[in-house]
């Protein structure tokens, strides 16, 4: 009875510990499936020193006392924190084969990592019958078929929409299975075998840890085994990355050894104590020297200030650092695939500016053989709502547009225009900052006769992304990665309409029309500056837009000097596939991977309102407001322009 009463309390405590990591809006993965060892174990083993019904994890307890028997559970491991950030169902983040959960009737989760597992056992937990074994003191507590065997029994392969997550290799060292370079390479190969088994079964996204430098852990630091452990860790990782680059799988590698070195070199940036020996001491004192200040029995117990809980396992702070690191890589394309959308948004604002000018001139062209020039300025705002694989963003900017047209005869005129646009976008949970300058030029032609009218424009542009700053949480701090790149665009647009008004000099005009638009934006690939564990290199991005639309435009003249005009159009986008972005860590250039990002809107509504006021016989003032709305995007712009006949 007591055990059953405490079960909800234990679950609530664990959920509370997870909730400290804010859940992000994008949620591109159906679930998170984890394989590995104690670094990822979500609670396969019972916790005899914890609350009834609790399970053990290889990190510190949540506090405030951190002591065994205190009623405090163990904190979450990195994949549990990551899953919470990705919006994965909490039950999916639980252990796969926990005897405690089975006894209590709690459904098994998707975390198959087991403390103590070697690379061969990790492979079995994926591929073997009875491959998931929970044993303590040579006693089998529970067994299950491996993940793929269990899925096959249900007629399923690997979930192609899931994120897979693998750690391993440390126990091959700790259990004496790696004593030389050849054995280190063989262990790395076994981990790659696990990756390939998942890939061949249909897995599309697989996160793989590089092994931490075992020479930089309390277990070996400062002792005679430190150089040996560091050397073999390096051999393992070199073989792992080499084989992964040839495995044919889409692998997101985590450069954990580099990340931890950065944390040790600048601990304050990660919220760690800068005045403590973070490698030679630990929190619990289990197999290592307890930190005298922040250790469990120190003067001020606080595991958040330390990297290691025991001789080889991170504190919750270390686990959160790794979760944030992984999330920063997975979320990068959610923001970076918005760069082409900044350009598309700017192009649409520029085209709206031209169309507003044309609408003000409708049935009111300059005389044959005469020029009409215009110059205008304005501002625009572009808002993106979050999607499954795209971040929310808020953009704003300003512009200068100028151009002119020449009337060839009664029915035709042609012209040119140019525009400069400055755009800024803040995106993601930490308001990453992306800035772009656009330089565009157009040639256009217009026709109006016998109530029919048409226009067509060809536009080209140069894009200067001069300040790109990706920001993200990292442990107890925040980091940004900077870069810059260029791009270009070209577009063609055309409209055809029929004026319902029977006379050209009618005070009102109303016209249905159809439209066709094509645009292509290309953003050059670039590398973020530096070679930190979080810096990325991105491939080129290309995003085309093909739209057909129909609408209604009208205008009304109040006398000979003042007119109001308006337009509504609905457009269908035919290039609406989710965008992919291929990238790699700067520190691991040979291991490229591809992730999903922004999905273009398949339907758009557009409204424009404006006025034109004649100031002198050859001089007019025009103002306008434009609004575009898709399912997840909103774009608005305002403008003011002068036109002069000469």
From Swiss-Prot:
Extracellular face residues: 25-397, 422-437, 462-488, 519-547, 572-605, 629-636
Enzyme class: hydrolase
Places the protein is found: Cell outer membrane
TM region positions: 398-408, 411-421, 438-447, 452-461, 489-500, 508-518, 548-558, 562-571, 606-615, 619-628, 637-646
Main location: membrane
Coiled coil: none
Record keywords, A-Z: Cell outer membrane, Hydrolase, Membrane, Serine esterase, Signal, Transmembrane, Transmembrane beta strand
Catalyzed reactions: a carboxylic ester + H2O = an alcohol + a carboxylate + H(+)
Domain of life from the UniProt record: Bacteria
GO molecular function: carboxylesterase activity; carboxylic ester hydrolase activity; lipase activity
Loss of function: phenotype: Strains lacking this gene produce only marginal amounts of extracellular rhamnolipids. They also show no swarming motility, and both other forms of surface motility, swimming and twitching, are completely absent in these mutant cells. Biofilm formation is also affected.
Membrane topology field: Multi-pass membrane protein
Secretion signal span: 1-24
Gene3D superfamilies named among the record's database cross-references: Autotransporter beta-domain, SGNH hydrolase
Autotransporter domain location: 366-646
Cellular-component GO terms for this entry: cell outer membrane
Entry-linked SUPFAM superfamilies: Autotransporter (SSF103515), SGNH hydrolase (SSF52266)
Annotated active site: 38 (nucleophile), 310, 313
Positions in the Periplasmic compartment: 409-410, 448-451, 501-507, 559-561, 616-618
Record family assignment: Belongs to the 'GDSL' lipolytic enzyme family.
NCBIfam families according to UniProt: esterase_EstP
Function summary: Esterase whose enzymatic activity is required for rhamnolipid production, all kinds of cell motility (swimming, swarming, and twitching), and biofilm formation; the exact role of EstA in these processes is unclear. In vitro, has pronounced esterase activities towards p-nitrophenyl esters of short acyl chain length (C4-C6) and Tween detergents. Also shows relatively high activity towards beta-naphthyl butyrate, whereas its activities towards triacylglycerols and acyls-CoA are negligible.
Entry comment, domain topic: Contains a C-terminal autotransporter domain that integrates into the outer membrane and enables the translocation of the catalytic N-terminal domain to the bacterial cell surface.
Name listed for the protein in its UniProt record: Esterase EstA
Species this protein is from: Pseudomonas aeruginosa (strain ATCC 15692 / DSM 22644 / CIP 104116 / JCM 14847 / LMG 12228 / 1C / PRS 101 / PAO1)
